[in-house]
């Protein structure tokens, strides 16, 4: 027979062990819940990032830019790679949340950079085209304007929209000082 005091002591030890195990289990369950929330949040952000990428590409397609600069394709490739890295990180088991968060941040930054470039390209190309069209009214009256517009059109068709815009506005400002403000205002409205 086992003495009662020993049984009581053993029961107390077992009770303490069970309490510690319950605490560890509760902590683990909370941690798993947090990991699931982080994974879910990352998947939501991936969806948002993909939407931004789609919007950036649609912006370029909608304007029908004649020539896209090489850096656009580099940034597009980097953005797609950033998304692929997020997907690869989400497919890993177990997921390392710190790595996943880094991939999501990097992917978002790359896609936003592409979106910004797309916006700038379409705005600059649109403004350059508008300036050339506006300047055409002076083409027959001013020989220098005709030559300048030929140069600006070549720059435009080669994809150097910023240079084309600068060339056209410089020529227009000689004939109509301050016209660039009116053109920008008209373009933005």
State where each predicted segment sits:
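Long, charged/polar, soluble alpha-helical segments
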Residues: 1-189
């Amino acid at each position: 027979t086992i003495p009662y005091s020993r049984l009581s002591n053993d029961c107390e030890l077992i009770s303490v062990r069970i309490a510690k195990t319950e605490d560890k289990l509760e902590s683990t369950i909370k941690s798993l819940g947090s990991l699931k929330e982080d994974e879910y949040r990352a998947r939501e952000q991936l969806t948002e990032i993909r939407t931004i990428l789609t919007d950036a590409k649609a912006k370029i397609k909608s304007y029908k830019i004649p020539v896209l600069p090489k850096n656009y394709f580099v940034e597009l490739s980097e953005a797609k790679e950033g998304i692929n890295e997020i997907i690869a990180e989400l497919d890993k088991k177990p997921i390392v949340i710190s790595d996943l968060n880094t991939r999501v941040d990097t992917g978002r930054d790359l896609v936003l950079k592409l979106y910004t470039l797309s916006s700038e390209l379409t705005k600059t190309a649109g403004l350059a085209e508008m300036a050339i069209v506006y300047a055409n009214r002076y083409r027959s009256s001013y020989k220098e304007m005709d030559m300048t517009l030929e140069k600006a059109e070549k720059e435009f068709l080669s994809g150097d929209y910023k240079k084309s815009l600068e060339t056209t506005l410089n020529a227009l400002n000689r004939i109509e000082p301050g016209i660039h403000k009116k053109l920008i205002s008209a373009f933005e409205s």
